[in-house]
């Protein structure tokens, strides 16, 4: 089982190709809805004062590649992964951490472990 790329699959296949919901509804289900369910304040939305966690993509090409096995776990163990398609950047707390070519070299990653939820 591999859920790598689930959000990309939702955006590319279920929203763009199958049109089961609007792009706005799909993004809300991937961002705002989980933040609300788990009681994580100021996440999953774009508004003044909220954390600037952003994902830049092309709705015409967003998706994921076919799953493939890589052997990069300790002891040479395998895992399944997919590559993003149509993704141009990821920002965490307002700091860009990924571009269309992959993870960026930065001195300090801006994310934090969420240890407390309000749910």
Where are these regions (language model features)?
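Active-site microenvironment of metallo-dependent hydrolases
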Residues: 1-119
């Amino acid at each position: 089982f591999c859920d790598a790329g689930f959000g990309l699959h939702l955006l590319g296949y279920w929203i763009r190709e199958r049109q089961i919901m609007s792009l706005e509804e799909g993004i809300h289900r991937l961002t705002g809805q989980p933040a609300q369910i788990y009681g994580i304040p100021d996440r999953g939305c774009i508004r003044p004062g909220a954390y600037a966690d952003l994902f830049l993509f092309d709705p015409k090409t967003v998706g994921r590649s076919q799953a493939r096995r890589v052997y990069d776990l300790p002891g040479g163990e395998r895992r399944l992964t997919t590559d993003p398609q149509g993704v141009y950047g990821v920002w965490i707390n307002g700091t860009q951490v990924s571009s269309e070519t992959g993870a960026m070299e930065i001195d300090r990653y801006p994310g934090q472990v969420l240890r407390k939820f309000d749910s």
